[in-house]
Amino acid sequence: MPALSCRFYQHKFPEVEDVVMVNVRSIAEMGAYVSLLEYNNIEGMILLSELSRRRIRSINKLIRIGRNECVVVIRVDKEKGYIDLSKRRVSPEEAIKCEDKFTKSKTVYSILRHVAEVLEYTKDEQLESLFQRTAWVFDDKYKRPGYGAYDAFKHAVSDPAILDSLDLTEEERRVLIDNINRRLTPQAVKIRADIEVACYGYEGIDAVKEALRAGLNCSTENMPIKINLIAPPRYVMTTTTLERTEGLSVLNQAMAVIKEKIEEKRGVFNVQMEPKVVTDTDETELARQLERLERENAEVDGDDDAEEMEAKTED
């Protein structure tokens, strides 16, 4: 089966001042030849004078073959197919937005191309027709090329009825929903923060326990917080959630509460690692650490302080 391809958006060429994602194909005397990834790899050129605001000492330090770059369109000749681009005119904020749009548009593209492969389409025109009847409908409806289709597909995970207005056969609709669910169903992430909590005053360990319990009370039904002792005075806080941003916020809130409580008792609070999403590798290493410490402390008085503290929720 031939590899199918199609542009991401309904319009065949970008507009002047659009920020687009390109892949560098070759470097010549006049500049760099690139492929516009969102426009079915049509060719464009970044002129040498548009690579950097500073004096160019080494082109290879500014741009490399095979690398993706965010660039802005400065001229389009649709008849001749010429597209002039600039790297130096792209602000950091524009680059971030470009990367976000490209990632979401590429996800939509991957879903629809896989649908086409499952349905055994053999021509690019068939894939383009699928785009016209799905992604581009939502892009046009919401006036947000790239984002419109992505947001609609995300919504379809919980409410497939959003696809009812599309001109699709029963089989096309079924395969599309299957692929949307596989690619866009939210995946739970684990968020972790490392903190130091200690109190060398009269209340000592009781003050630490009270502060940690106050942090645990920031748990919600959907985001339970756990706190484990790594080695005094260091603790690891974790939560598992479908909402990354909310998870980070909940851990930050819990840390603020712990800090306030322990400092009321003239204790010490330090952040060793800010809240972040952790990988399976991070979790495996943490489990090994905890297991080793448990063995080392097995015969030490006060072992109960090393037990996992977990939010208790009412049944």
UniProtKB/Swiss-Prot annotation:
Main subcellular location of this protein, as a coarse class: cytoplasm
Cysteine pairings via disulfide bonds: none
Gene name of the record: EIF2S1
Gene Ontology, cellular component aspect: cytoplasm; cytoplasmic stress granule; cytosol; eukaryotic 48S preinitiation complex; eukaryotic translation initiation factor 2 complex
Family assignment from sequence similarity: Belongs to the eIF-2-alpha family.
Keywords (A to Z) from UniProt: Cytoplasm, Initiation factor, Phosphoprotein, Protein biosynthesis, RNA-binding, Translation regulation
Domain S1 motif: 17-88
Entry's Gene Ontology molecular function annotations: ribosome binding; RNA binding; translation initiation factor activity
Residues in coiled coil: none
One Pfam entry name: EIF_2_alpha
Compositional bias per record (Acidic residues), positions renumbered to this chain: 299-308
PTM comment, free text: Phosphorylation at Ser-49 and Ser-52 stabilizes the eIF-2/GDP/eIF2B complex and prevents GDP/GTP exchange reaction, thus impairing the recycling of eIF-2 between successive rounds of initiation and leading to global inhibition of translation, while concomitantly initiating the preferential translation of integrated stress response (ISR)-specific mRNAs.
GO BP term, pick one: negative regulation of translational initiation in response to stress
Main function: Member of the eIF2 complex that functions in the early steps of protein synthesis by forming a ternary complex with GTP and initiator tRNA. This complex binds to a 40S ribosomal subunit, followed by mRNA binding to form a 43S pre-initiation complex. Junction of the 60S ribosomal subunit to form the 80S initiation complex is preceded by hydrolysis of the GTP bound to eIF2 and release of an eIF2-GDP binary complex. In order for eIF2 to recycle and catalyze another round of initiation, the GDP bound to eIF2 must exchange with GTP by way of a reaction catalyzed by eIF2B.
Organism: Gallus gallus
Modified sites of kind Phosphoserine: S49, S52
Subcellular location per the Swiss-Prot or TrEMBL entry: Cytoplasm, Stress granule; Cytoplasm, Cytosol
Region annotation (Disordered) ranges: 292-315
Assembly and binders: Eukaryotic translation initiation factor 2 eIF2 is a heterotrimeric complex composed of an alpha (EIF2S1), a beta (EIF2S2) and a gamma (EIF2S3) chain.
Lineage, opening ranks: Eukaryota, Metazoa, Chordata, Craniata, Vertebrata
CDD domains named in the record: S1_IF2_alpha
Name assigned to this protein: Eukaryotic translation initiation factor 2 subunit 1
InterPro entries membership: NA-bd_OB-fold, S1_domain, S1_IF2_alpha, TIF2_asu_C, TIF2_asu_middle_sf, TIF_2_asu
Notes on activation and inhibition: Activity is regulated by phosphorylation at Ser-49 and Ser-52, which stabilizes the eIF2/GDP/eIF2B complex and prevents the eIF2B-mediated exchange of GDP for GTP, thereby preventing the formation of the 43S pre-initiation complex (43S PIC). This results in the global attenuation of 5' cap-dependent protein synthesis and concomitant translation of ISR-specific mRNAs that contain a short upstream open reading frame (uORF) in their 5' UTR.
